[in-house]
């Protein structure tokens, strides 16, 4: 009886996570804070608002200052999309490959910290790319590498300049 109850709770949580990226990030995503280490991803109200704007529009440009957590938000949004939508492709483009790689690293950290019942498993896992068993993937490239020309229109692009 208890085992059946646990399975039902997990199923309900999975559905809730799939339907609500804010809930998923706040409840299950961990981030690396520069001074406090591994902490829960407690989104600020402006991050939640930004996420809703990103979800409503196909094309977005964000003019921002540094250290607002927008890259971390993009990592959480990318992970959510990868987990709950099969064959999702995320292309991270930045002026330097290391900058793009940092976002992939954030996605990997968030994934690694998830409870086991949310994990799908990797097919490919390296510093520049992650591919999940459901066909979803994220790749990091530099803007100098003709990034947009070699990938089809079915990629969700995250560009950091």
Predicted regions and their residues:
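Phosphate/NTP-binding elements of NTP-utilizing enzymes
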Residues: 2-161
């Amino acid at each position: 009886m208890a085992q059946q109850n646990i399975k039902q709770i997990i199923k309900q949580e999975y559905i809730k996570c799939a339907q609500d990226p804010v809930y998923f990030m706040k409840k299950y995503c961990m981030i690396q804070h520069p001074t406090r280490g591994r902490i829960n991803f407690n989104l600020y109200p402006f991050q939640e608002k930004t996420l809703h704007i990103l979800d409503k529009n196909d094309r977005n440009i964000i003019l921002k200052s540094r250290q607002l957590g927008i890259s971390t938000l993009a990592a959480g949004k990318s992970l959510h999309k990868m987990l709950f939508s099969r064959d999702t492709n995320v292309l991270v483009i930045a002026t330097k490959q290391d900058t793009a790689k940092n976002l992939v690293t954030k996605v990997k950290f968030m994934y690694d910290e998830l409870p086991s019942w949310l994990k799908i498993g990797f097919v490919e896992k390296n510093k520049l790319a992650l591919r999940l068993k459901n066909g979803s993937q994220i790749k990091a490239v530099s803007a100098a590498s003709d990034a947009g020309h070699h990938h089809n229109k079915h990629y969700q692009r995250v560009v950091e300049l």
